[in-house]
Curated annotation (Swiss-Prot):
Zn(2+) binds at C63, C67, C86, C89. It comes from the Eukaryota. GO terms for biological process: COPII-coated vesicle cargo loading; intracellular protein transport. Disulfide bonds: none annotated. It is a peripheral membrane protein. One of its GO terms (cellular component) is endoplasmic reticulum exit site. It is found in: Cytoplasm; Cytoplasmic vesicle, COPII-coated vesicle membrane; Endoplasmic reticulum membrane; Golgi apparatus membrane. GO terms for molecular function: GTPase activator activity; zinc ion binding. This is Protein transport protein sec23. The gene is sec23.
């Protein structure tokens, strides 16, 4: 099968099952697997939308303990004997009584060959409706606070009618608003400079009395404990909550000109976590933190109140010149673990031109499946539109967000799972599917994600099991299998289970060509990028770049065709040719190069990379570039190269985080002269409008909303484009063929051509 046909096949599998594998044939021995260089891995999007597949309204049929695999199309079913054989453990299981009518021609949906992904609505109702706690920073100017209040009031109408809502505001002090008290505005105040233990928070809010262990609790009803004073159903309390929000004032504490406002983000957060963990353990909830500056007092503060003391930079972190960093990270990580253990999500939204301490707070979202959003202000359309998108709904008017989610992976005996890289924490569950090595969050076959949405994607890594001695070859084609079980609380109030079962052939004897042909370079690049970013969190930057280079050289040595020590003979098969340039752009990307980005921005970019699927992640690693000119109708994809900058062309760059329209020198002059508004120049007007329309389409369904930049050749904003291009024409090389028609880039970075020359030289020398 040729590469294009294989790509279409992988794309169909991704549409149906939300999964892409780095290798679509599994090696049959551990030795063979070690020579692959790129690990066997899957980028899996559990809740990928499947509008055409049915929601099964009954409990799944599972194999006996300890296996617990769910009945799937790969199971052998004997309809006469009413038994099925589990493909994971080969145990025989009786079919339940309500399957008595099945025949070869009438089978239940979960056995249909195309039902490799199926979703069940479980009978178990959620213990409480979804909970939303808004944690709002009041140390901000009036315009920003008003815009934020408007966004929050608007969001109340987007919540499910039974959702519980709470409000905590903070500045110099943290205040928990007692929304259930209608006589007047009433709140409990916590001192911003003091650290409160979980027990103290519960006692001060009067929640401890609600912890009577034998209190009868009706399912799907909130526990009618003391927390009901602070968390009210939105339908019943929309008026009160709106009133409280409208009356919110800027923090009254005076701020001197040379000082930052005193802001106790850590106290507000610990109160929110304490409030939910007392009464709503393992019930779906979201703590949404809106901050307009760094925490400057109390636990978790990231900078002092003196303005002359700058917030830490990457340079400070490298030199270990970080006064507050370690203590703050320890505090927020502890909060994140508490929230994750209870199934609660934490989102952090920043509306501030300066850093807010996102680097220290990042694990609040990374451990709990929350969102991180960095914007310049809450008045910006980037914040307003991104915030609304969080509350997107499906055709049945249910929120497209799952709560309290967990993922379990089962494998057949040939495979073992080595870990997961994505927004989750380990559930420390051991099984026969757990591998010996560790990649990412390992030593477990189950993870808790808490928050999950239709775009949430996870990198799951596998190894080939160590078979002792020569295994007896079974008759028929051999295959390895994996099953992904995603449990989550649906916003309709029920638990759902999404099951995806994957089977792939095992390779034949050593040197089987099907192994190399099964390599999906796009999925592999994304899985390797996740490992590189995971390493970058703990290792030095240069070490990570060396690891990326070493892996690329080894992969090329193993799979390219060449004569030893002859770089000119180097050839890669079609399904490997793009991989080196993905790695070239990954090395230069903001995920691994921190120069020109603040630590907060680096944390944000890495967070988003670990959330998206293969397609969107590739746009982040290697942005797309389209060119528009009067000679061609519509857009033409062009190389991400400085040679693509031409005076009479318009370029549209999509980096996922930025969408940029760049006018070449001549086009910019024509536009400034106003030719597009004159008669006879309608084609120029159309040309100027076209990239804007295409940009609008790109922005339409993206989260977070990208920054939109329009610039001209030579303008200061053009740096966003120049920094992404392969510098094939620099001040040292001049243009192609001596004529300088394209842009010259002033940089010492190597070009893709130089990079490839070095790669070929090293790969054919066999010294790696």
């Amino acid at each position: 099968m040729d590469y294009e046909a294989l790509k279409d096949q992988w794309s169909d599998v991704e549409d149906r099952d939300g999964i892409r594998l780095s290798w679509n044939t599994f090696p049959s021995s551990r030795m063979e697997a070690s020579r692959l260089v790129v690990p066997i891995g899957a980028v899996y999007t559990p809740l990928k939308e499947k509008p055409d597949s049915p929601l099964l309204q009954y409990e799944p049929v599972t194999c006996k303990a300890p296996c617990r695999a769910v009945l799937n199309p790969y199971a052998n079913v004997d309809v006469r004997a009413r038994i099925w054989i589990c493909p994971f453990c080969l145990m025989r299981n009786p079919l339940p009584p309500h399957y008595k009518d099945i025949t070869e021609s009438t089978i239940p949906p979960e056995l249909h060959p195309m039902s490799t992904t199926i979703e069940y609505q479980l009978a178990r109702p959620a213990p409480a409706p979804p909970i939303f706690v808004y944690v709002v920073d009041t140390c901000q100017d009036d315009d920003s606070l008003k815009a934020l209040k408007d966004s929050l009031i608007m969001s109340l109408s987007l919540l499910p009618v039974n959702a519980l809502v709470g409000l905590i505001t903070y500045g110099t002090m943290a205040q928990v608003h007692e929304l259930g008290y209608t006589e007047c505005a009433k709140s409990y105040v916590f001192r911003g400079s003091k650290e409160y233990a979980a027990k103290q928070v519960q006692e001060m809010l009067g929640l401890a009395s609600g912890l009577r262990p034998n209190m009868p609790q009706q399912p799907a009803r909130p526990p009618l404990g003391p927390a009901a004073r602070f968390l009210l159903p939105v339908q019943q309390a929309e008026f009160q909550i709106t009133n409280v929000l409208e009356q919110l004032q800027r923090d009254p504490w005076p701020v001197a000109n040379d000082k930052r406002p005193l802001r106790c983000t850590g106290v507000a957060l610990s109160v929110a976590v304490g409030l939910l963990e007392t009464s709503f353990q393992n019930a779906g909830g979201r703590i949404m933190v809106f901050t307009s500056g760094p925490a400057t007092e109390g636990p978790g503060h990231v900078v002092g109140p003196e303005l002359k003391e700058p917030i830490r930079s990457h340079h400070d972190i490298d030199r270990d010149n970080i006064k507050y960093y370690k203590k703050a990270v320890k505090f927020y990580d502890n909060m994140a673990k508490r929230a994750a253990n209870n199934g609660h999500i934490v989102d952090v939204f920043a509306g501030c031109l300066d850093q807010v301490g996102m680097l220290e707070m990042k694990n609040l979202a990374n451990y709990t499946g929350g969102h991180i959003l960095l914007t310049d202000s809450f008045t910006s359309s980037q914040f307003k539109q991104s915030f609304v998108r969080i509350f997107d709904k499906d055709a049945k008017d249910n929120l497209l967000m799952g709560f309290n989610a967990s993922l379990e992976v089962l494998t057949t005996k040939e495979l073992k799972v080595t870990g997961l890289i994505g927004h989750a924490v380990s559930l420390n569950k051991k099984s026969s599917s757990v591998g010996e090595t560790e990649c990412g969050i390992g030593n477990t076959c189950a993870w808790k994600m808490c928050g999950i949405d239709p775009a949430s994607s996870y990198g799951v890594y596998f190894e080939i099991a160590n078979q002792g001695g020569p295994a007896a070859v079974q008759p028929g084609p051999q295959r390895g299998m994996m099953q992904f079980l995603t449990y989550y609380q649906h916003s309709s109030g029920h638990y759902h289970l999404r099951v995806t079962t994957v089977a792939r052939p095992l390779s034949g004897p050593a040197g089987d060509p099907t192994l190399a042909q099964s390599f999906d370079q796009e999925a592999a690049a994304v899985l390797m990028a996740r490992i590189a970013v995971f390493k970058a969190e703990v290792d030095d930057g240069p070490d990570v770049l060396r690891w990326v280079d070493r892996m690329l050289i080894r992969l090329c040595s193993r799979f390219a065709d060449y004569r030893k020590d002859d770089p000119t003979s180097f050839r890669l098969e079609k399904n490997f040719t793009l991989y080196p340039q993905f790695m070239f752009h990954l090395r230069r990307s903001q995920f691994l190069q921190v120069f020109n980005n603040s630590p907060d921005e680096t944390a944000f970019y890495r967070h988003v990379l670990n959330h998206e699927d293969v397609g969107d992640s590739l746009v982040m690693i290697q942005p797309t570039l389209d060119s528009y000119s009067l000679e061609h109708e519509g857009s033409q994809p062009v190389l991400l190269d400085s040679a693509s900058i031409q005076p009479a062309h318009i370029l549209l760059l999509d980096t996922f985080f930025h969408i940029l329209i760049f006018h070449g020198e001549t086009i910019a002059e024509w536009r400034k002269a106003g030719y597009q508004d004159q008669e006879g120049y309608e084609n120029l007007k159309v040309l100027l409008e076209q990239p804007k329309e295409d940009a609008r389409e790109l922005i339409s369904d993206r989260f977070p909303l990208p920054r939109f930049i329009v610039c001209d050749a030579g303008g200061s904003q053009a740096r966003f484009l120049l920094s992404k291009l392969n510098p094939s024409t620099t001040h040292t090389t001049g243009g192609y063929g001596g004529g300088v028609t394209s842009q010259i880039i002033f940089t010492d970075d190597v070009s893709l051509q130089t990079f490839m020359d070095h790669l070929m030289k090293l790969a054919v020398s066999g010294t790696s």
